[in-house]
Swiss-Prot record:
Monomer. SUPFAM superfamilies: Class I glutamine amidotransferase-like, FGAM synthase PurL, linker domain, PurM C-terminal domain-like, PurM N-terminal domain-like, PurS-like. Phosphoribosylformylglycinamidine synthase involved in the purines biosynthetic pathway. Catalyzes the ATP-dependent conversion of formylglycinamide ribonucleotide (FGAR) and glutamine to yield formylglycinamidine ribonucleotide (FGAM) and glutamate. The active site is at C1162, H1285, E1287. Its main location: cytoplasm. Pfam families: AIRS_C, FGAR-AT_linker, FGAR-AT_N, FGAR-AT_PurM_N-like, GATase_5. It catalyses: N(2)-formyl-N(1)-(5-phospho-beta-D-ribosyl)glycinamide + L-glutamine + ATP + H2O = 2-formamido-N(1)-(5-O-phospho-beta-D-ribosyl)acetamidine + L-glutamate + ADP + phosphate + H(+). The keyword Flavoprotein does not apply. This is Phosphoribosylformylglycinamidine synthase. Gene3D superfamilies: 3.40.50.880, Phosphoribosylformylglycinamidine synthase, linker domain (1.10.8.750), PurM-like C-terminal domain (3.90.650.10), PurM-like, N-terminal domain (3.30.1330.10). It is found in: Cytoplasm. Residues 1069-1320 form the Glutamine amidotransferase type-1 domain.
Amino acid sequence: MSVVLPLRGVTALSDFRVEKLLQKAAALGLPEVKLSSEFWYFVGSEKALDAATVEKLQALLAAQSVEQTPKAREGLHLFLVTPRLGTISPWASKATNIAENCGLAGIERIERGMAVWLEGALTDEQQQQWAALLHDRMTESVLPDFQTASKLFHHLESETFSTVDVLGGGKEALVKANTEMGLALSADEIDYLVENYQALQRNPSDVELMMFAQANSEHCRHKIFNADFILNGEKQPKSLFGMIRDTHNAHPEGTVVAYKDNSSVIEGAKVERFYPNAAENQGYRFHEEDTHIIMKVETHNHPTAIAPFAGAATGAGGEIRDEGATGKGSRPKAGLTGFTVSNLNIPGLKQPWEQDYGKPEHISSPLDIMIEGPIGGAAFNNEFGRPNLLGYFRTFEEKFDGQVRGYHKPIMIAGGLGSIQAQQTHKDEIPEGALLIQLGGPGMLIGLGGGAASSMDTGTNDASLDFNSVQRGNPEIERRAQEVIDRCWQLGDKNPIISIHDVGAGGLSNAFPELVNDAGRGAVFKLREVPLEEHGLNPLQIWCNESQERYVLSILEKDLDIFRSICERERCPFAVVGTATDDGHLKVRDDLFSNNPVDLPLNVLLGKPPKTTRTDKTVAPSKKPFHAGDIDITEAAYRVLRLPAVAAKNFLITIGDRSVGGMTHRDQMVGKYQTPVADCAVTMMGFNTYRGEAMSMGEKPTVALFDAPASGRMCVGEAITNIAAANIGDIGNIKLSANWMAACGNEGEDEKLYRTVEAVSKACQALDLSIPVGKDSLSMKTVWQDGEEKKSVVSPLSLIISAFAPVQDVRKTVTPELKNVEDSVLLFVDLGFGKARMGGSAFGQVYNNMSGDAPDLDDTSRLKAFYNVIQQLVAEDKLLAYHDRSDGGLFAVLVEMAFAGRCGLDIDLNLLLAQTFITNHTALSQSLRTEEVKALAEWQETIARTLFNEELGAVIQVRKQDVADIINLFYQQQLHHNVFEIGTLTDENTLIIRDGQTHLISDNLIKLQQTWQETSHQIQRLRDNPACADSEFALIGDNGRSALFANLKFDVNEDIAAPFINSGAKPKIAILREQGVNGQIEMAAAFTRAGFDAYDVHMSDLMAGRVHLADFKMLAACGGFSYGDVLGAGKGWAKSILFHPALRDQFAAFFTDPNTLTLGVCNGCQMVSNLAEIIPGTAGWPKFKRNLSEQFEARLSMVHVPKSASLILNEMQGSSLPVVVSHGEGRADFALHGGNISADLGIALQYVDGQNQITQTYPLNPNGSPQGIAGVTNADGRVTIMMPHPERVYRAAQMSWKPEDWTELSGWYRLFAGARKALG
């Protein structure tokens, strides 16, 4: 039993968080109470800690010992919120890590809780309601007193496995176990297992059954996609997967790996990649190598329904691991994400089309999913260090043909692209005797049965089993594991990894067998060698839990020493768990009980269970003609702008780091006003090239209700019209990922799925496209009992297409931002050819008007022709702006382009309206005069169709002088009849849409944009500090204050480092990182460009004495999440130096050396600020605390470089320019100085507004720092720290917006060149 030391911390909840809780309580009718909160820390150890250790703990945790813990009393109620009993929180893992690295011996674990005190009279029932408000039952417990916190450290006794008596009880015994264990085995699979175990003449263990269930779940084996289909009584010729494979067979060119690894690999290019060279003491060098592109997209729907934060976080983490475990190891680079949920029903903003049908108690509401889920996904990406650059958000919940269709089981999609050395793309064969290794985090009792649970309709499983199936994420340890993988593949042909897989559904029980089975091997494992963070787990829990951040891999025994040294340097846990055999048999040995929980042939586990046959019939949707003659067009426009699929997505974007890695060219935010309207994401392949990668998405689920195959073709079409904005070239260079969601088993849905796969396969083959990767989630149905009523919500068939392609020149990417140039016009290309079909449109959704025909990709040759023309115009720099038509139709395209460009529009749709009317009302158009036509309801309907149909198409802005040539290009492709000159830009802040002289819409663009951003604003208010959300909303229309600009006091094209570079002298710079830091590569690249000799220095190198700071002239402490920021950003990193006498002396000596320079950025800034006591001239320095918004802020912000002593900023003084910020704790705090800012403080960087005034206004000042402080320097200017990231934007191509005259380098290169000059 552990000794538990309680320590009292600081206030836990901010004033606005308290106010939100009180508002929620009031909404439940609870009586008024006074609420206070504080953090408490519980330190578990084998024996009582000595006084010196306790003193260090208090300093580390900012906490105090107490003689006795406080108790609740009459009228004062205690709610002690802790991690869920029986689990170990990610916070605890990281905090304990810090204590170990600070030399605090004897500590078993540190956990954190929050004591909430409520003063007031409450009944038992009211206390239960408050408990529900105060904790997340998925991840937390509420304890009645402090003594109960000892249960956090309770150790269970280990148990052995159990068996199911198949020999004695036959099939019935297995049927019973199937239900009790939540295995989701089919009747065929139960028969298969009974037959095989009877042949083996033994009973199956519970471990083997769970392992089989996971390995053979729909989630893992995709049985429906490999099934036979009988539709309307006829056997179909191909499986779903067969039709997907047809696309690759027809167009294999450009694809390196398809269908046989964790990700697909497509051809890239030979580029110079930048990373440390182990043979040169970890010196950063450029390496020219053939580099291919990884593409992967998958979903995490079931866990996100149950626990949105954890579900979305581990969804992102699992997809990242898939990329990293491709081939023999690779590097994830940039991500995408998306969410589809039912109606939000935002309090105070309930929309007229929203109805609340109810939901099962154990799943989260759509609003909670969208408040918590995106934060979970973003937090994982941020902490791991992968920019998220693309996404979508859709809501739908509607009664259609007698069924409620919607997304109570949400779609949470996570994907991305990565880079891989050509020589690492294929796994090698694992030889007999090879070691089988687990790399990454330890196992714990979470995520049991996730694969099987996600394969079931939501609501058909026991609620407790649903909770058991959700994992928890620890991105910081996944980052450490990725660093190990990076060090391995960076060894090139000396890479020790033979083969690698990520650990996902089914845990080790799925990953290890998959690893050896791929090589035709068997294996022997030692169960008790598996690293665990919880005591007392039984064999099933050890072998089958889905603890995240783990990989399995194989190496030769001779490479164990080098692999161990890499892991030790990165502080990444690993264990040799097994050995490969040549007998095809799987044995898991438990030495604790001297038995074998698993002992069976692999062909029983992964053999061919009976093939599934799916039988279904066509269920045709009811057809209702589309009518909209009585709808006010302006009102419709405002409704459409509020629909989440159309509305601004700021609340989903600014929470995600979009610049980490320094390879981002085009993120979601466009132009000098940073408007979230980009069509595609674009990254660069290296720091010395403009080659890159692009990715886009296409999804049209509401269309599937009307015509499922059409929805599939439209998804492909939308992905192509989105990615066409990038400089790709031949359409065959684009490769697609297809993610399929359906409610299989619901009558008619299997048939829709089959016909849609068939349609997409044929369309892709006609377009020269292939689908080398994808995933399915085919249990998209939620069922529950509501009193006497059985309810269900069935999702429409939902295909999400993600397109990936190599880019020839990222600088040619075109955005939707309208350019304020003279003599430009807007052209509209209508790929719907006047049909203007309205089925499934945003317009229909906001009026509950589920009628009309489905839009479709009727002619693939015309889409290809359109793409070819756009690509030629992109390559020739003929497009000023480009935006494809999608949700919200042409109206949404126009207003989004206007929002981005902050300019008015004068649009005349006369000819387009005529085409729409003639196409849909041919007889009327031939028999009536124009004025008679315009008096008809059909004409009003034509206006609605023209403005709001969502057929494929695009608007382009071009110079007037180029119009004739551009029309001729479309003529050559036989598309000229579908190109319309529709209008021009104006100086007025007004949108005018006309039919000749008749105004259809005439409205203020500020008002329209406020409506467009209202949904995002309201969710942001509920999630973050509402005062900050309101401040950002109030800036809409204040163009002068919110515009980005550059005012440099130097020549951006002059390289002041050039003379020093030409001299050949290269000062050595230590690029310093700690575990969890993720910004080292771009920091090293920036300094290398300025003539430094950069070296990768890990804190473990300094602690082990492999490296000494005295060998360097400069130190750069990098950004990221050292130890996951668990004790305050940068604090744990700093304490590991201050509490280590040798390191403290080494750093102090470096800081006092007059010949050195230091730069701390972001997490490095926070860390160095905590070392102020050993840095001369830092009196008055702030610490950095949580942002005022209490949210991670990723922005392109304006800063000013004031006059200061800073040597590295000396050459930039007086300049103002945009810079990337990405942090959660960047607010300069002067509490240690009584809240006073010293007149002598060396302020080196300040946030300013668009008028170059120091600002406190959020988000122009993204964190609330007083006096706009973004960076400070010490008295002699040798040590400068800042929260923004100049290293991520030293190249002009890295900036989301830049002045036109910035070509190769941005203004921020001057900082790095200035450092080189300062060292002489």
